[in-house]
């Protein structure tokens, strides 16, 4: 549970104005609120605790501490006034004392027993100041001094006022009072040159020199990323530098290493990440980092320790040692010059041992307690914490299990005893466990004795004859009233009777006469809603009244989040998370985001783009459509001029054009059409009962839907006709069936008048197919349609090609389209359904158009 403490400068200098007219204190308040919004986007922020400290005299400087909730924090933040001195040192000391208030009681520091990285209380101190001179009642101070006296017991056990899991970050406001005419420089925010910078670096943090609002937003984004669970450690090199590695990956002894020149990676002051356990949410570990002294019972008091342990690493390459059934702790190092140097060596199968000076009794440097090793993928460097002096212990345990089979000889016992003498006494649990194992070796362990339970199945008094049971029955039936004086107060000494909450209204369902006259209508409404909504829980008040919250409490999400149940853990935390690839692969998970207001200004002006409708927008042409039909607005297809039917939406602009789904026909004046034994003459552009056009579009291919066929489809049509065999049958691709026309047609075309028809002179005069062949082809098409609808993706070309090959009249094609729509609805293929419905509308309109033309032709006769 991270602790976020905000230290706000309330000195009089915070009243100075910026070029926007706002004071520094107003900017500080807005920065805190913006940080809370950015932090609330992370689901892990549910356990955050916020504190507020000012530059006032203690104890009045603590505005929100351990006992105050989030609402009090926000109220105190809004009521801050700038009217004091710049007592930064005293304010920092008060902040650290507030954080360390409960550490001695909770046992996190574990003085004299090693440093456990998994015992931590990660804290982030964020101070917002103007960076002016430090002032106090004694005058102006040139340097930052923290008072040494502390009222907390046990503070003398640590040399510094902070701990290794507490980091300080400073936002130093340097905003000008006059707008700058120079263009703003983009890039990283530099550190400030004030006195607080050095204090930030000592704790493992840093300072930010804020000169514009954009830089402030950038700093807040960076601070949100800094909220990590971990501890700060000093890594220092001991011994000579390693030999350089050549291009072939081997040691190059011919290239001398510069051991005397100080390199940045020789000494690093960085964080190691302590990840919480995925099952419990709490960090779990096994081995401590040794103390820098050998504990002795004769010491009058423990020597004070430094806040950050000094861990020395030797650059001698060693083999990483791990055995089965022996746990180890693994911590990732924050990126630093040390991690960069180790990764550049590209040796993931070697490690560098780490030591703590004066941790051993007979060795000044101490014995190794772990090692630094690059990951196998060379992406990070990890610190492995093992048992103390593990190069001696691990071979002994390996021999005990594999060679001696848990029956050690005298030589092994002597070697193990000599190892225990080098072990610090605070490894007590390990030592006691080892002694228990040694004592039980060769002996049969005693059988575990279970808990004895009395058998009440027979021989005892019946439950109904029990005096207390009969008394309880009388109290339930109402014969005797339950008296509170009969309760044994000693048995429930820690229990308290809850006070009546006046905000909760009593339920008035039992007796209708208890309802006040003015509440009869409201009560009747509630009873009716409860009666009709049987699937919900019975509510005693209107749902609208639950949202009647004062404006001052509308943004208080923290108290509500604390009441929510914790999210369930992953079933298999070691299994990599499966990416959500359905729909838009670039979609981000919005779960856990909690945003009250639109805060687009966080991204700055560089992320603003024009609206998609503007012509000059670079993003308008690349803007992706929403994948969800429920979220997508209905698009209106562009209206174009149709040379046949006037204005209307073209079919090619809405769904993929498949010209043969409704068969186009070659038409010309004076063309004679023979269909089912009836010969009709097309004159003056009249439409025959079969729906053929004549003069309205001479020498062009006209779609029966009333739209002109695009020119690029004329070639495809000609290819279809030229693929006919000499016997007048079409061989279907991918099958052995032959497909012909469903009707006997004879087209008489004048080659001199129709140039398009003349190009198709090789077309046969008759297309024949039997009804049995058509039925078999349609059954095969229906089976393939079912397969294509079930396929994943949005490639629908094959579906429309199959629909084109359906044999039979127009009513048969309509049935196939309706069948495909039903199949698509089973698998929720909404886009495909939309395309098919458009095709169905075209077929219906064409069928209606044919019927009307047929009636008109008969009436004219």
UniProtKB/Swiss-Prot annotation:
<dbReference type="GO" id="GO:0032039">
    <property type="term" value="C:integrator complex"/>
</dbReference>
<feature type="domain" description="VWFA">
    <location>
        <begin position="3"/>
        <end position="227"/>
    </location>
</feature>
<dbReference type="InterPro" id="IPR002035">
    <property type="entry name" value="VWF_A"/>
</dbReference>
<dbReference type="InterPro" id="IPR029307">
    <property type="entry name" value="INT_SG_DDX_CT_C"/>
</dbReference>
<dbReference type="Pfam" id="PF25462">
    <property type="entry name" value="Beta-barrel_INTS6"/>
</dbReference>
<feature type="region of interest" description="Disordered">
    <location>
        <begin position="605"/>
        <end position="626"/>
    </location>
</feature>
<feature type="modified residue" description="Phosphoserine">
    <location>
        <position position="617"/>
    </location>
</feature>
<dbReference type="GO" id="GO:0034472">
    <property type="term" value="P:snRNA 3'-end processing"/>
</dbReference>
<keyword id="KW-0597">Phosphoprotein</keyword>
<protein>
    <recommendedName>
        <fullName>Integrator complex subunit 6-like</fullName>
    </recommendedName>
</protein>
<dbReference type="InterPro" id="IPR051113">
    <property type="entry name" value="Integrator_subunit6"/>
</dbReference>
<dbReference type="Pfam" id="PF15300">
    <property type="entry name" value="INT_SG_DDX_CT_C"/>
</dbReference>
<dbReference type="Pfam" id="PF13519">
    <property type="entry name" value="VWA_2"/>
</dbReference>
<dbReference type="InterPro" id="IPR036465">
    <property type="entry name" value="vWFA_dom_sf"/>
</dbReference>
């Amino acid at each position: 549970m991270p602790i976020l403490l905000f230290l706000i400068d309330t000195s009089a200098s915070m009243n100075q104005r910026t070029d926007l007219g706002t004071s520094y204190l107003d900017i500080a308040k807005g920065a805190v609120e913006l940080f809370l919004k950015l932090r609330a986007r992370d689901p892990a922020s549910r356990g955050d605790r916020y504190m507020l400290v000012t530059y006032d005299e203690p104890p009045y400087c603590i505005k929100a501490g351990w006992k105050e909730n989030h609402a009090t924090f926000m109220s105190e933040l809004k009521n801050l006034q700038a009217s004091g001195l710049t007592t930064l040192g005293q304010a920092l000391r008060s902040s650290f004392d507030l954080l360390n208030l409960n550490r001695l009681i909770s046992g996190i520091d574990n003085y004299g027993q090693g440093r456990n990285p998994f015992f931590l209380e990660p804290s982030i101190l964020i101070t917002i100041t103007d960076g002016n001179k430090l002032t106090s009642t004694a005058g102006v101070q040139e340097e930052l001094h923290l008072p040494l006296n502390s009222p907390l017991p046990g503070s003398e056990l640590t040399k510094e006022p902070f701990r290794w899991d507490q980091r300080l970050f400073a936002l130093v406001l340097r905003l000008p009072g006059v707008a700058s005419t120079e263009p703003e420089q983009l890039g990283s925010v530099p550190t400030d040159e004030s006195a607080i910078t050095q204090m930030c670096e000592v704790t493992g943090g840093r300072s930010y020199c804020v000169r514009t609002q954009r830089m402030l937003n950038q700093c807040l984004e960076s601070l949100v990323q800094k909220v990590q669970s971990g501890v700060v450690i000093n890594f220092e090199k001991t011994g000579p530098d390693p030999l350089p590695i050549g291009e072939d990956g081997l040691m190059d002894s011919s290239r001398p290493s510069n051991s005397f020149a100080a390199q940045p990676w020789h000494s690093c002051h960085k964080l190691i990440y302590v990840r919480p356990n995925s099952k419990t949410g709490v960090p779990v570990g096994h081995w401590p980092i040794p103390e820098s002294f050998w504990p002795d019972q004769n010491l009058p008091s423990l020597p004070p320790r430094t806040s950050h342990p000094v861990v020395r690493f030797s650059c001698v390459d060693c083999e990483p040692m791990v055995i089965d059934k022996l746990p180890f702790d693994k911590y990732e190092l924050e990126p630093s010059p040390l991690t960069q140097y180790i990764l550049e060596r590209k040796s993931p199968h070697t490690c560098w041992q780490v030591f703590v000076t004066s941790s051993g009794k007979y060795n000044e440097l101490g014995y190794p307690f772990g090692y630094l090793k690059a990951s196998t993928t060379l992406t990070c460097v990890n610190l492995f914490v093992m048992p103390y002096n593990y190069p001696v212990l691990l071979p002994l345990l390996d021999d005990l299990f594999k060679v001696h089979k848990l029956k050690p000889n005298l030589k092994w016992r002597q070697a193990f005893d000599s190892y225990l003498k080098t072990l610090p006494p605070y490894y007590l649990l390990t030592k006691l466990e080892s002694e228990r194992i040694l004592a039980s070796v060769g002996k049969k362990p005693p059988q575990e004795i279970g808990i004895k339970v009395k058998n009440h199945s027979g021989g005892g008094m019946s439950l109904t004859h029990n005096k207390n049971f009969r008394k309880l029955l009388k109290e339930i039936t109402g014969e005797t009233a339950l008296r509170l004086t009969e309760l044994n107060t000693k048995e429930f000494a820690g229990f308290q009777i809850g006070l009546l909450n006046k905000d909760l209204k009593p339920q008035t369902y039992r007796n209708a006469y208890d309802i006040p006259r003015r509440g009869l209508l409201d009560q009747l409404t509630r009873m009716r809603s409860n009666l009709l909504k049987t699937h919900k829980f019975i509510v005693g008040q209107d749902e609208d009244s639950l949202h009647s919250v004062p404006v001052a409490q509308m943004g208080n999400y923290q108290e509500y989040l604390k009441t929510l149940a914790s999210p369930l853990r992953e079933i298999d935390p070691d299994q990599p998370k499966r990416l959500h690839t359905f729909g838009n692969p670039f979609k981000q998970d919005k779960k856990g985001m909690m945003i009250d207001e639109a805060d687009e200004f966080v991204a700055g002006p560089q992320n603003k783009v024009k609206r998609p409708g503007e012509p000059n927008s670079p993003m308008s042409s690349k803007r992706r459509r929403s994948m969800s039909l429920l979220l997508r607005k209905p698009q209106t297809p562009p209206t174009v001029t149709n040379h046949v039917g006037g204005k209307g939406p073209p079919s090619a602009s809405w769904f993929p054009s498949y010209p043969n789904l409704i068969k186009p026909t070659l038409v010309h004046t004076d063309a004679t059409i023979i269909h089912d034994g009836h010969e009709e003459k097309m004159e003056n552009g009249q439409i025959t009962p079969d729906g053929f056009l004549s003069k309205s579009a001479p020498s062009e291919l006209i779609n029966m839907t009333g739209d002109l066929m695009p020119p690029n489809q004329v070639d495809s049509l000609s290819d279809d006709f030229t693929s006919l065999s000499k016997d007048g049958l079409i061989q279907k691709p991918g099958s052995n069936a032959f497909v012909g026309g469903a009707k006997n047609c004879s087209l008489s075309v004048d080659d001199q008048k129709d140039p398009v028809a003349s190009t198709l002179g090789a077309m046969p005069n008759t297309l024949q197919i039997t009804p049995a062949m058509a039925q078999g082809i349609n059954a095969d098409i229906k089976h393939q349609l079912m397969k294509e609808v079930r396929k994943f993706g949005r490639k629908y070309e094959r579906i429309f090609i199959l629909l084109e090959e359906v044999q039979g009249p127009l009513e048969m094609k309509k049935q196939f389209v309706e069948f495909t729509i039903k199949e698509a609805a089973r698998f929720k293929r909404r886009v495909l359904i939309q395309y098919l419905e458009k095709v169905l509308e075209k077929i219906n309109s064409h069928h209606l158009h044919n019927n009307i033309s047929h009636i008109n032709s008969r009436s004219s006769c």
